[in-house]
Amino acid sequence: MKIRIAVPSKGRISEPAIRLLENAGVGLKDTVNRKLFSKTQHPQIEVMFSRAADIPEFVADGAADLGITGYDLIVERGSDVEILEDLKYGRASLVLAAPEDSTIRGPEDIPRGAVIATEFPGITENYLREHGIDAEVVELTGSTEIAPFIGVADLITDLSSTGTTLRMNHLRVIDTILESSVKLIANRESYATKSGIIEELRTGIRGVIDAEGKRLVMLNIDRKNLDRVRALMPGMTGPTVSEVLSDNGVVAVHAVVDEKEVFNLINRLKAVGARDILVVPIERIIP
């Protein structure tokens, strides 16, 4: 039984999605010629490239069994899909922003009849209804941040990762509407009828995500100092300890640690007598 996964053809979430699939063992067979459909290293999995904004609807309609796209686009489309995984990248906030010199400090200050420019009219209109705000929504397809300065709108809603673009354009966030990141989604019928292969891929993807920012630290230590090493290397469920057959009184210790802790950890390990220390990248962690 085959499945098709829709992946963004371009944009900031495209290459990370392709890289994630590759690391999960589902790399593209043809990495040079980007076509609409591409076979992968897995004989039962095919990739379909499309606009990120169209992926929620393609998955909901069954044109693709799975999809990788932003949560903001899923909500904007209102697509009936199963969200399987948060892929831990592409994080951004959909914010309501006004010019720095505006008297609007919060949603309660928005005057009746104000105009809001956005690429997300559905989410914006829902927000206005929830807050009882009588405002007009104007849909734009880009350069939303200039709308207040050319007389098109009084405010905007736009995606922001760091806030830098808003500040550069003299805009100030007055409210956060939605937190977004990239999701793995599934067609509901496909998830029921093709659960075997879908769960196989899901496990591979989750293993890659769980391994990000982790390193396997391996070392040798005299048994008499083992407890001191254990205190420094708790690992995921405790360090793995095994005998070193060629050297009496020495044991090997393995543990998974956060990458950001490695630098300081090595110095502390050496201080308690650890030697032959190896730090190894981890491709996947499968619980």
From Swiss-Prot:
InterPro entries: ATP-PRT_HisG_long, ATP_PRibTrfase_cat, ATP_PRibTrfase_CS, ATP_PRibTrfase_HisG, HisG_C, N-reg_PII-like_a/b, N-reg_PII/ATP_PRibTrfase_C
Cellular compartments annotated: Cytoplasm
Any single GO BP term: L-histidine biosynthetic process
Cofactor: Mg(2+)
Ranges in coiled-coil conformation: none
PROSITE patterns: ATP_P_PHORIBOSYLTR (PS01316)
Involved pathway(s): Amino-acid biosynthesis; L-histidine biosynthesis; L-histidine from 5-phospho-alpha-D-ribose 1-diphosphate: step 1/9
Key words of the record: Amino-acid biosynthesis, ATP-binding, Cytoplasm, Glycosyltransferase, Histidine biosynthesis, Magnesium, Metal-binding, Nucleotide-binding, Transferase
CDD domains: PBP2_HisGL4 (cd13594)
Class of the enzyme per the UniProt entry, highest EC level: transferase
UniProt GO cellular component terms: cytoplasm
Stored Gene3D superfamilies: 3.30.70.120, Periplasmic binding protein-like II
Enzyme Commission designation: 2.4.2.17
Description of how activity is regulated: Feedback inhibited by histidine.
Catalysed reactions listed for this entry: 1-(5-phospho-beta-D-ribosyl)-ATP + diphosphate = 5-phospho-alpha-D-ribose 1-diphosphate + ATP
Pfam families found in the cross-reference section: HisG, HisG_C
Organism domain of life: Archaea
GO molecular function: ATP binding; ATP phosphoribosyltransferase activity; magnesium ion binding
Family the entry assigns: Belongs to the ATP phosphoribosyltransferase family. Long subfamily.
Record-linked NCBIfam families: hisG, HisG_C-term
Function: Catalyzes the condensation of ATP and 5-phosphoribose 1-diphosphate to form N'-(5'-phosphoribosyl)-ATP (PR-ATP). Has a crucial role in the pathway because the rate of histidine biosynthesis seems to be controlled primarily by regulation of HisG enzymatic activity.
PANTHER family (alphabetical): ATP PHOSPHORIBOSYLTRANSFERASE, ATP PHOSPHORIBOSYLTRANSFERASE ATP-PRTASE
Name this protein carries in UniProt: ATP phosphoribosyltransferase
Record organism: Methanothermobacter thermautotrophicus (strain ATCC 29096 / DSM 1053 / JCM 10044 / NBRC 100330 / Delta H)
Gene behind the chain: hisG
